[in-house]
Amino acid sequence: HLPSEKPPPTPSPGDGKCLPFWVPYGSYCYLVYNDKQGYSWPDARHVCQSVRTELVSIHSRAELEFIRNLNYTENHHIWIGLTRDQNFGWGWTDNTPLAFVNWASGEPNDAFHPGEAAEENCVEMYPDGRWNDNNCMLKKGFACRHRQFYTTDENKNPVFPTDSTGGGK
């Protein structure tokens, strides 16, 4: 039989700052919104962007487990930043490379539901961490991510480092 899986390696903590109430992990910070009402995927992305962050992109098993553990209520599955790109492939909204995936069995299935305007072009994460493509208009929880920051501008807003490498280190 297979050797038992070792827990995934944890990145060394970053030395930057997070927005208030956001949780640091590696060199990023995370927040899961999971109130009762839920948000459509476009509304969820808008909430992240309203504080100059982006829907979460996930680059390792360790990062996935960290986000799963932040989602401590059972209200919703949570939207992540994976969506159809122009070429009908899948891409992260923050333009980081799609190197790690964790689709549920049989997904993505691009199901089309008669009577619904939207095909399954947005991706949710189940409580077990698996991913499913679903109708973007469904209301769910969601997770945002930002790079840790070191300085603020004259209005006390964080100056986020640009993620030129795209790595989720």
Model-derived regions: residue spans:
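Extracellular, disulfide-bonded carbohydrate-recognition/adhesion ectodomains
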Residues: 1-169
